[in-house]
Structures are given as C-alpha cells and as structure tokens.
A protein has these predicted regions:
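A short, glycine/small-residue-rich beta-strand->loop->alpha-helix junction that serves as a flexible
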Residues: 6-20, 44, 72-75
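Short amphipathic alpha-helix
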Residues: 16-29, 246
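Extended catalytic core of nucleotide-activated donor transferases of GT-like folds
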Residues: 43-135
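Nucleotide-sugar-dependent
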Residues: 215-253, 259-267
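A short acidic/histidine/glycine-rich donor-binding loop in glycosyltransferase catalytic cores
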Residues: 271-278
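A charged, aromatic-enriched C-terminal amphipathic alpha-helix characteristic of glycosyltransferases
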Residues: 279-282, 286, 293-329
C-alpha cells in the first residue's frame, strides 16, 4: 500500500505555502506527492481533462491511501472529477480542508454549497480547521463519520532565530484589502505592516514595509514585539472558524500574540500564556503600552516549546499519523 498526498503548483500565496508545507512533512513520513497544477480548467475539453487526471493519478493503486488537500483552487468540477478518478481505485480517501472558498468571499452564491458538500462527502475521513467549521458544514449536509480537527498550522523552518527582545510594537502581515480595519490604527504604539497592498495612512506610527517572504518575516518578528491576529473585513465570521496562518508564523518567531476575542485559538492563547486576547485595537495598544519587560519575557518563555513544535512540523506530523491510523484501524 502506498500513501499519497496532493500538492499545489502554479499559484502563489499563503494558501499555496500551507499545502506545500503539509506535503513536505508528509514526504518525511513516507507519502508520495501527487502534484496538481492551478490552471484555467475551462480550457480543457472533457477528454483532455480526463487524460490530465489519469496522468496525475497514474501512481495510485487499488487499496492505497490518499489525502486530498482542499481546495485545489481550480473549479469545483475539477475537484469532483479528480476525486471520482481516485475513488475508482478503491482507496482510503481523506480530504484535508484548508479553506472553504464559498465562506471566504463576500457574494459567493449559496447554491454552491450542495456541490461542495457532495465533494466532502466522498471522503472516508475529513480533516477540518475547527469545531465551529465542522458544525457549519454539518448544517449544510456534511455526512462524513470520521473527522479529525486540525490542531494548528506548522511552519517548518531549520534556520536560527534570535530570542525576541522587549519591544513595544506590533506586527501585522496580510492583505489590507481583506483586513481593512487595520488601516484605522490610530495609536502611539508602532504598527509595522507587511504585504503587497500599498498603504497610505496619516498615522506616523504605522510603518508599511512591503512584502517579505517567510524567512524574512521570521527574522523581522524575532527582533521583538507582538503579532496581531484580526478578523477579515468581508465575511468576518469565516475567520472565527478557520485556522489563522498568522498565528503559527508569530509563534514560530517566538513572539507573543494579540488575538481578537472569538477567533480560533483564543482559548489556546489564554491557557498557554502565548499573549493576550483583546476586544479592540485600543485594548491591544493598551496591553503593549502597559506590559513590563519581565512580563514580556515570561510570555516569550511560554512560547519556546510550542515554537519548537511548529518549526519542526510536529502538529502536522501527528495529524497525518492520526489520519492514517483512523483510516486503517478505525
């Protein structure tokens, strides 16, 4: 029996990096990569698509185990057709949900959900980002019996990082189009922004520093400060049931976080002393303004162990091993 996992190519962004990080950890556990390419699916005829899918699945044999990282960011019809070809091999199939596209973007038609749930219901096991996401999908018709909840994103990183220094400043990385509330920052605590969107604000304490890759971000974060995690502007409810990639990046760098109340991992941050849960930007700024150096370094010390786990990929390793055990042993 061979274990397979899909991996996405031909696109860029955090969503692609997440799939590639999972596939990297999976390869270390003995999985074979099944490469998918992001492309205009409508350019294929039915016959061309079938040839493409046959090529992608050529290494899959009867009785194998397959983990499909969802979505492929191609059309839903592509995902369904691919899974139908995979299922024809009588495999054990797990679908690892990274994002639910219909929940992410404002104006996404509700009539898409039946097609999406039909795809999810093809799985023998489903990996979901959170309990709230699972309950939402069940309301839409999800019927998969075997489910695992993803604990947290990993960020595999083998480089050396400094111990963060005590700094009264806040970091935020992301699209200012998606997180428009960030533009209203009006406090004396410095806010350092990283992303593609150009920022033109009036507050001299907001510093826009452009896009940086993962390694560059980790180096900047590890110089000291706090990482901010906030809901997106459109469809904010999505951020309340989805895994925030920002969290693992901040923690991998060893810095405390400021997470908006109600988001996934609010409880984790509280219980493990990884930072603060806040209701508003004003409260976040107050926390940074009033914390002592001793209190800051206590938070940094609290983060050491979970930072190690994230950089070594342990959360993903355990999740993948649990997936294999659950599929094969029940």
């Amino acid at each position: 029996m061979t274990m397979h996992i899909t991996n996405l190519y031909g696109a860029w962004g955090t969503h692609v990096l997440a799939q590639q990080n999972v596939a990297k950890v999976a390869r270390e556990l003995g999985f074979t990569e099944m490469g998918l390419y992001f492309y205009p699916v409508d350019s294929d005829t039915g016959g061309e698509l079938r040839k493409r899918l046959d090529g992608i699945t050529s290494a899959v044999g009867n009785g194998d185990l397959v983990i499909f990282q969802s979505p492929s960011w191609n059309a839903l019809s592509y995902d369904k057709a691919l899974l139908e070809v995979i299922r024809a091999h009588r495999v054990k199939l797990a679908i690892f949900i990274h994002d639910v596209i219909t929940m992410m973007f404002e104006g996404a038609p509700e009539e898409i959900y039946p097609s999406l749930i039909e795809i999810y219901n093809m799985a023998d096991l489903l990996i979901v980002p959170s309990e709230p996401m699972l309950e939402f999908l069940k309301e839409k018709g999800l019927a998969v019996g075997k489910v695992l909840i993803q604990p947290m994103w990993d960020l595999p990183f083998s480089g050396e990082l400094r111990v963060p220094e005590f700094q009264r400043r806040i970091f935020f990385s992301g699209s200012l189009q998606r997180f428009q509330a960030i533009s209203s920052w009006n406090y004396e605590i410095p806010l350092r922004l990283f992303g593609y969107d150009e920022f033109k604000g009036k507050n001299p304490n907001v510093h826009f520093e452009g896009w940086k890759n993962t390694t560059e971000l980790l180096i900047e974060y590890s110089k000291g400060g706090f990482g901010l995690i906030w809901e997106q502007t459109a469809r904010p409810e999505y951020y309340r049931c989805n895994q925030p990639h920002k969290l693992c990046t901040y923690l991998a760098a060893g810095i405390p976080v400021l997470i908006q109340k109600g988001l996934v991992h609010e409880r984790t941050v509280r219980e493990y002393g990884l930072g603060f849960v806040v209701d508003s930007f004003e409260e976040a700024a107050d926390m940074v303004r009033n914390i002592s150096e001793e209190e800051y370094y206590q938070l940094v010390n609290n983060i050491k162990n979970i930072s190690f786990l994230i950089r070594e990929g342990f959360f993903t390793k355990k999740l993948l091993i649990d997936t294999v055990n659950y599929l094969l042993l029940g």
